Structure formats: structure tokens, C-alpha cells
Amino acid sequence: MQRFLVVNDMKIIFATGNSGKLREASEILDEGFELVTPAQVGITEDIPETGKTLRANSLQKAQYLFERCGCDCFADDTGLEIDALGGEPGVHTARYAGEDKDFNRNMDKVLYELSVLESSGKMAQEYGLQTRPASRKARFKSVITLIFKGETHLFEGTLEGEISRAKSGNGGFGYDPIFIPDEYPGKTLADITEEQKNEISHRGKALRAMAKWLKENA
């Protein structure tokens, strides 16, 4: 079985082809870790993610990678949960507007659906019906599955906030231009610096928990 653990310099495979996730993880994990992509060890096919929950998807991806290479590895699955949409996109976050994972279209769909809910509420009020304003409250959740020395460990992180009314900012990736974190009122994740985002992000919290565990148990 090939493994990548080397004393104080830990090489570990991150089951992602997403350059944004890889950059974020590399910046959050300190110099004691070196991330390796599946492509770098010859795994170029799409890693399956057919689970019905974030945990299931994260576990499925990590197990697939471990079975293919037998290496220390980890995978994450992240979902955006919007209260007014009943928790959607949730596990469908990356493919909310289609299988092509087009995040501009994903964001457009979210903004449209929330605007429709708000319009419906206003119309109902005009007819004297009692309604509550559509909530824009939302949260990101990340679940990381680490397979280390053949054993499986889970780490989670959550970021609370709300959905903006329009895209804003040029930074980040994914849904960042429409997510306003509670820590930065009036600013989306794409408006703040990468350093500021990494300090509060859902994935950052899960990654730091994983890094702490590895340093204590490697």
C-alpha cells in the first residue's frame, strides 16, 4: 500500500479538481502539509458523488480515492442551505441549475427563486392575506472525510449568513458573490479578502479541525 506520510512534511491527496477549493485548502493548511491532486497520482476520471447527504458524498469520494490508490486522502462536500427554499440547494449545490456545474447559472436560479417568493408574498399582502417575508437566511456546511492509515474520520464546519439581492465582488468562487456572512454585514464572500474569508469559512473550519487532528495523531 502506497502512503504519502513523511515525518513532518505531510503529503495528502485532496479529492478535488476544483482549483478554487485547492487554492483555499493550500492557504489554510500550513507549511506542514503538501496537497496532492488525484490527477497527480494518475486518477483522472470523475470521482462519483451520488449520496443523498453531504456526509454520504464526502465519504463516497474519499473511499473511492482510497480504494484506487491506497493513500492517505480526504474529500469534502459542501452545501448551501437556504431557509426560504426548504434547505435547497443542499446536496445539489454544485448542480443546482444543471449538470454542467455552472455557478453563474446556479446563482441566477437562487436569486430568481427568492425574488419569486418575495413577489408572491407582496401580492398576497395586497389581497389582505397574512404572510411572512421570505427569509434570506442561509448557511454553508462543509463535511470533510479523512482516511488516514486506513481509518475514517469526519470533520465539519458551518458558516451562517444570508443571500444578497444581487451578485457582488470579484473574489472567491462558487456562490461567494451572493453570500453575505454574518461576520461582514453588507459584504459578500466575494467582496472580502481571501485571508478574511479563510478565517471564517465553513471549509476553513473543517480543514483546521482536520489539520489539528493530524498533528496530534500522525
Predicted regions and their residues:
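Anionic-ligand binding patches
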Residues: V7-I13, G20-A218
